A protein has these predicted regions:
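Secondary-structure boundary elements
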Residues: 27-174
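Boundary at the C-terminal end of the N-terminal hydrophobic targeting segment
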Residues: 17-23
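General secretory precursor processing signal
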Residues: 16-17, 182
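Sec-dependent N-terminal signal peptides
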Residues: 4-13
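Hydrophobic/aromatic-rich core segments of domains that either
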Residues: 22, 130, 134-135, 139, ...
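Prokaryotic Sec-type signal peptides and long signal-anchor helices
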Residues: 14-15, 43
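Catalytic beta-strand/loop cores that center a nucleophilic Ser/Cys/Thr
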Residues: 177
């Protein structure tokens, strides 16, 4: 799927179209084996003890995640892991003051998903929510974004590397990461408190053969730019503002029909 965003060309990578609550779409994992496929079958039939206390909203959210997540995630992580993440997402939506302001489309694509890049998935949503919920309590949404980024800066500093992107909790444990890891970490932290967020990446600047990744977060009807773990007093301010305005290609990931 391709979308044009001013001032740069912006590509959102997604799976084929299907509605969030649509029950007739073909199941992507129906031919696969293992806990993930078994659980998806149980979601459709209601035949499992795991679903005794699941709500209709949680069921729909799980169907969306399983429909669009990478196949490796279906087989690598347990159904309980995804259910815990779904429940924490809805808890944040209920308890954070901006929860009711986030449109369903944005919640579905930029809060609910766990994956940001090619990192291993972990329990960061639950951990980050417990640590951040009181810190941003009572704040306006834009102020909360800035505060979360301050918190991220306290946890992680920049260090270049060429390895695979580390998981958010692994980044916290090491206390450092490159821009791709810092932005993955910051997106995970923002999503943990119910703020729509996405990683934005340019593979090459106009002025040099180098790349960069940063964060966009949504508040009050608009997307705002911020440098991950690089706190500023306001949004839409970063050292990369000028080169980003001249970048020819930027992309992000959006799982589902967005």
């Amino acid at each position: 799927m391709k979308k044009t965003i001013i001032p740069a060309l912006f590509f959102a990578c997604c799976a084929p179209a299907a509605g969030f609550a649509h029950s007739a779409y073909p199941l992507a994992v129906k031919a696969e084996k293992g806990n993930g496929a078994d659980f998806m079958h149980a979601l459709r039939t209601g035949k499992t003890a795991q679903l005794k206390n699941i709500t209709a909203t949680e069921r729909t959210a799980l169907e969306f995640l399983y429909r669009y997540m990478p196949l490796a995630d279906v087989t690598d992580y347990s159904p309980e892991f995804f259910l815990d993440n779904v429940r924490t997402s809805f808890m944040a939506q209920k308890e954070m003051p901006w929860g009711g302001e986030v449109p369903e489309l944005l919640f579905r694509h930029f809060v609910l998903p766990i994956r940001v890049n090619n990192e291993n998935l972990d329990d960061s949503r639950m951990v980050f929510y417990k640590e951040l919920k009181d810190r941003v309590k009572g704040m306006a949404m834009k102020d909360a974004i800035l505060e979360v980024n301050h918190w991220c800066h306290e946890k992680v500093t920049y260090r270049p590397s060429d390895g695979r992107t580390s998981a958010p909790l692994a980044t916290v444990r090491s206390a450092y990461g490159r821009c791709g890891e810092q932005s993955t970490f910051t997106v995970a932290a923002l999503r943990a408190v119910g703020i729509p967020a996405r990683q934005v990446y340019t593979p090459r600047w106009a002025h040099t053969d180098d790349n960069h990744a940063w964060v966009e977060a949504w508040a009050d009807g608009k997307w705002y730019v911020l440098g991950a773990c690089e706190p500023e007093p306001v949004l839409n301010l970063g050292w990369f503002n000028a080169p980003a305005s001249r970048a020819m290609l930027m992309h992000t990931r959006a799982f589902g029909d967005y």
